[in-house]
Amino acid sequence: MRALVPMVVAATALASPAPALKPRLDDGLARTPQMGWNTYNQYNCFPNESIVHENAQALVDTGLADLGYRYVTIDCGWGVEDRLPNGTITWNPELFPQGFPAMGQYLHDLGLLFGVYGDSGILLCGSPPNITGSLYYEDIDARTFAEWGADSLKYDNCYSDAATNYPNVNYAPSTSPHPRFANMSRYIQAQDRDILFQVCEWGIDFPALWAPEIGHSWRIGNDIIPHWRSIFRTLNQAVPQTDFAGPGQWPDLDMLLVGLDGVLTVPEEQTHFSLWSILKSPLTIGAAIPGMRAESLEILSNADVIAFNQDALGVSAALRRRWSDEGYEVWSGPLEGGRTIAAVINWRDEDREITLDLPDIGLQYAETLQNVWADETVNGVKTSYSSVVEAHGVMLVQLAETVEEGVYPADVFAATNRDVTTFSDVYAITSSPNFVLNITLTEVTAAATNITIITDSSRRPISTSIPAGSSSISTSVSLIAGSNNTITIRNAPPLSSITLSPPEPTYYTGAQDFTLTSPAGAYTCPDAYCLPAGSKIVDLSTESAATAHINSSTSGSKYLEIDYINNEVAFDSSWGWGANSRNLTIKVNDNNPVRLEVPLSGRHSELFGPGLGWWDSGRLGVLTDGWIKGTNELVLSNEGGEGGFTKYAPDVVGIAVYD
């Protein structure tokens, strides 16, 4: 075991080395995520001219176009099997009697943009009936799309693997799809027209590492399906990709389900739209706009949520904490102007009050908090904010004029009565006597000053002295995990603030500090992988466990940060219950285990990358109960995995214990 530098945010990602991304082409496109409408979710591979005209006009009539939804894309089903004698691709004249150039002009006359759809294989997705793809015809097709007046190209991945005789789908091709997409990108960029290029190869070969060089967005995973469960699956796949987002390069979580009849409830639609927005996914409506229910149209038209997506800073929100047993999780990220956006998802099937502890998103105080869907604005939020969140709903909050985590200005958090100053709403991530308290005075002391410090959990007051000529002093204090601690300071000169730092954690390496039961084993990774330890526990399951004996200075609840590895990507299983997650249980002594369903962590290709993505660490934190002073037994396993979760737990690199 060894000491580990404390983490500032409650949960972060550990990234194994990845090749540096080259700058996106400076073509001025997609400086913020693209927005629009696509035929597929509502009409599948059966679009026609009147469908596109009606929905395009509805974009304008409803005001959606003015809000930014401008790319109108005709997805699969628009073409024919044979090319023209000159080799050019063409549209189905029965479905689009006026033709695609006329369609482009129609959309442009409405102030919209024309999105076309192609495929990097020999046929388009949705065949049969067979519709020709662009493989081996990239040059002529790129020129044709430009001549039609296209403003964007969604480029798909069906019928593309030559080595296996061009099957409809191959999630494990023998070669990367990268060269095929790069080839079309090169020809698109050669046109005398700006065309936004959307890479749609379903997350195969971890496109976040190569797609930003050739396209403006890339699909992070398989198609979204018309079920609530697909939201969890998609978010789990997004976790290791959020930091790849930026102007001109956006992870695409796939089209929106909002507005599709009978698919999602209103709270579910709010959750879906909120998370796609703050993760900086392109926002592409997939439902029919004419006749859409008012609640769905209102969600898609929410100017605040759209603004979060289109924020000029261009930084995605990231997963901060996940409470699997309690059924909720927190995502957050920065916005322009020093603001913060946060989303708390209620995965349970019931309405309930949920509390957001601001330190979980790196904050201690917000002068203003806007609860978007509750239509509520609160001033002076200290440490925590609670609100009722509907079943499968989301608490989406924007925080402004904030103070960073661990900093407690006296004029906000303290009350003074004569020579006694008490700070309330003090947050502790863990129960420990080893928090570092720094007290800052309003001015330098003229003489040495003796003060007394009392906390809720300390058995005796702490007496210390502020030296003459000093304006601050530090000492260790004891706090209890939670957001309701108080710190009382007696006999102190006027105070400016206090600052609290968590205890320095002790790190326990999975492969070295744990005793393993078969079939679990230890695996040593190459240099600079399986961070921070360079090794990991593998094959933890419902039938095996890893046990460590850990000394604790106090009893109570302890915060742990778990460095895990999971790259079990849900490709075929995405159509069913595949969730891109693995289940881990953490048991302290004889207490009930805490369950943590971890997302993907892989940041390299699952087909060709180092370790196939199984050397890339992620990190999530959990609060565990039942610790005693002295020696504790900590057991990692997958208890209950046979009851609907995956059999195997994630690989475990190690655990940091905050004591």
From Swiss-Prot:
Substrate binds at residues 201-205. Residues 1-20 form the signal peptide. Optimum pH is 5.0. Its EC number is 3.2.1.22. CDD domains: CBM35_galactosidase-like, GH27. Optimum temperature is 52 degrees Celsius. GO terms for molecular function: alpha-galactosidase activity. Keywords: Carbohydrate metabolism, Disulfide bond, Glycoprotein, Glycosidase, Hydrolase, Polysaccharide degradation, Secreted, Signal. The active site is at 156 (nucleophile), 223 (proton donor). Glycans are attached at residues 48, 86, 130, 183, 438, 450, 484, 551, 583. GO terms for cellular component: extracellular region. It is found in: Secreted. Coiled coil: none annotated. Hydrolyzes a variety of simple alpha-D-galactoside as well as more complex molecules such as oligosaccharides and polysaccharides. Active on paranitrophenyl-alpha-galactoside but not on raffinose, locust bean gum and gum guar. This is Alpha-galactosidase D. It comes from Emericella nidulans (strain FGSC A4 / ATCC 38163 / CBS 112.46 / NRRL 194 / M139) (Aspergillus nidulans). The lineage of its organism: Eukaryota, Fungi, Dikarya, Ascomycota, Pezizomycotina. The gene is aglD.
